[in-house]
Design a protein with these regions (language model features):
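Conserved structural core of kinase catalytic domains
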Residues: 320-386
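Short alpha-helix
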Residues: 158-182
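Catalytic activation segment of kinase domains across protein kinase-like and atypical kinase folds
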Residues: 153-154, 384-451
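Conserved SAM-binding loop of SAM-dependent methyltransferases across substrates and taxa
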Residues: 29-40
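ATP-binding glycine-rich loop module of kinase domains
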Residues: 269-308
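Conserved class I S-adenosyl-L-methionine
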Residues: 124-147
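A short glycine-rich, Lys/Arg-flanked "PGG" loop and its adjoining helix->strand segment in the class I
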Residues: 104-122
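C-lobe/activation-segment region of protein kinase-like
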Residues: 420-499
Length: 500
């Protein structure tokens, strides 16, 4: 937990110029210190624990812009003479009673910190939501390990407190009418893979990752993904998000970034993050950025892919969102509409499985027409990515293949149909049926409510044999290994790491 690179996701997306002076309060073992050192001109850490300070210093011994001050915050704070562009409280604010000896420690904590901010500076605060849905669903309170302790208002414990959105808002107001932009890390702020905001809340069906309980035994009292959808439909998600990330300042100047999705549980050569941004005029756009220097080529290659695929797909009426190279990443057109996945789910929930099948197969046939123009032949590049699979000589393919044509990446609009993600496009033959296999597999298997469709034999109806299913499952495993390289994603260690 202390050393996972995923910890850095909580703030690595925040735009820095490289000239910032940053104060990190409660830096611990340096979970986010490295990210700050990469982005800022100067980083000062305050940490009470000698052992944790030494670990942090050793981890970041090559950073010449880092200073670690060891001691009690109230004492160290009195010696600070500088003003800071950012002051971070990542998993620290809940310990306010231990940091500040007063009648209103949490309010006073923010008041004291605010004195050290530059006029346009920001406090970056990450904390669990006392009313987070995971606690209702059977997760224990993070700090005390007991069920419902936070939900009931901490009746049997003291020293640590988390807050609801309403409670946190009241603290900000009392601390000097501080302004905050609210973000919602998912599954939580500790190991976030997606960050939502008030300007871009989750969409129905997006919150379906549940393997996130790494520290203690939990109960499973209900299906969280279904309850999330219900909360979203009733505009209640912000009150029940598992965690909050607040950008706090004396003035509310919104960051352009309103959504971040990390794809960095991969080989560094493929490690990226995707952002939705909104400029001052309200216009939205998408950015895809490398999270490592080694993944720049992978990201910038998207611009060329978009031009080549655009011509390729146009024959079947499929468009691609415009992509242009911008600085170290690419900028993509922001498109609005409903995904094919969402439309299929609506039909499923309405019990219209025949209409669902008809719609799904209209796209399966469309993709088949695009990708079966040539006879398949195996290349060294194919073997490198997918393994030496025993592909039938009668398989059809195309010279260029986007294997990620899953329903979630097909956007239905009034003006037409667009493919919104084509990151995994290869310029060598891949069996058309493998692309169709992935279309079906990632729709049926990514949400439990779709299990009822498995008896409809979608694979067989798509012309995929039992033998092919075995081959394509092995190809998919090999592709995942290729994408991950030597990296082992935390999710794959869940059964070994989590106590249940």
């Amino acid at each position: 937990y202390h050393f996972s690179h995923i910890r850095e996701n909580i703030l690595s997306w925040i735009p820095f110029t490289g000239e910032e002076n940053v104060l990190e309060i409660g830096s611990g073992c340096g979970a986010v210190t490295g990210a700050l050192c990469k982005k800022a001109k100067k980083v000062t850490c305050i940490e009470l624990s000698r052992k944790r300070s030494q670990i942090n210093a050793w981890r970041h011994r090559d950073c010449d812009n880092l200073k670690i001050l060891m001691g009690n915050f109230q004492e160290v704070e009195k010696t600070l003479t500088e003003k800071y562009d950012y002051i971070t409280l990542i998993g620290v604010f809940e310990y306010g009673e231990a940091y500040i000896q007063s009648e209103t420690p949490y309010v006073d904590f923010l008041k004291i910190i605010s004195r050290h901010l530059k006029p346009d500076g920001k406090i970056v605060l990450a904390i669990e939501n006392r009313l987070g849905l995971k606690y209702w669903a059977g997760c224990t309170e993070d700090h005390f390990g007991t069920l419902f302790e936070g939900l009931e208002g901490y009746p049997t414990t003291s020293g640590v407190k988390t807050f609801s959105r309403k409670e946190m808002s009241a603290i900000l107001k009392e601390a000097g009418d501080l302004k905050a932009s609210w973000y919602y890390p998912f599954p939580d702020y500790k190991l976030p893979m997606t960050i939502y905001s008030d300007r871009r809340l989750p969409l129905k069906g997006e919150l379906n990752r549940l393997e996130t309980n790494y520290d203690r035994l939990r109960l499973q009292l209900f299906q969280e993904s279904a309850v999330y959808d219900s909360l979203l439909a009733n505009d209640m998600y912000p009150d029940f998000a598992n965690s909050f990330l607040l950008l706090i300042g004396k003035e509310k100047k919104e960051a352009e970034t309103i959504y971040v999705k990390f794809s960095n549980e991969r080989d560094p050569a493929f490690s990226v993050r995707t952002e939705i941004c909104e400029n001052s005029s309200g216009r939205r756009y998408v950015r895809k950025l490398p999270t490592e220097k080694t993944s720049e080529e992978h990201v910038k290659n998207l611009e060329k892919i978009s031009r080549e695929l655009g011509t390729f797909y146009g024959r079947e009426g499929l468009e691609l969102n415009t992509c242009t190279v911008e600085n170290d990443g690419v900028r993509l057109e922001y498109l609005q509409g409903e995904t094919l996945e969402g439309r299929l789910d609506e039909l499923l929930e309405a019990g219209k499985t025949e209409e669902l099948e008809k719609l799904f197969f209209s796209y399966i046939k469309k993709i088949r027409r695009i990708h079966e123009g040539e006879m398949f032949f195996k290349t060294p590049e194919f073997v490198q990515v997918f393994g030496d699979a025993e592909i039938s000589e009668s398989c059809r393919c195309s010279g260029m293949s986007n294997i990620d044509l899953v329903p979630a990446n097909i956007l239905l609009q009034d003006s037409g149909v667009s493919v919104i993600d084509y990151e995994w496009t290869f310029r060598f033959p891949i069996p058309c049926n493998f692309i169709l296999y992935r279309m079906i597999h990632y729709y049926l298997e990514s949400d439990g409510k779709r299990a009822v469709l498995r008896d409809l034999d979608f694979y067989k109806k798509a012309g995929i044999s039992e033998k092919e299913l075995e081959i394509y499952a092995e190809m998919e495993r090999n592709f995942q290994k290729y994408m991950e390289g030597g990296h082992v994603p935390l999710r794959e260690m869940y059964d070994e790491v989590s106590p249940g």
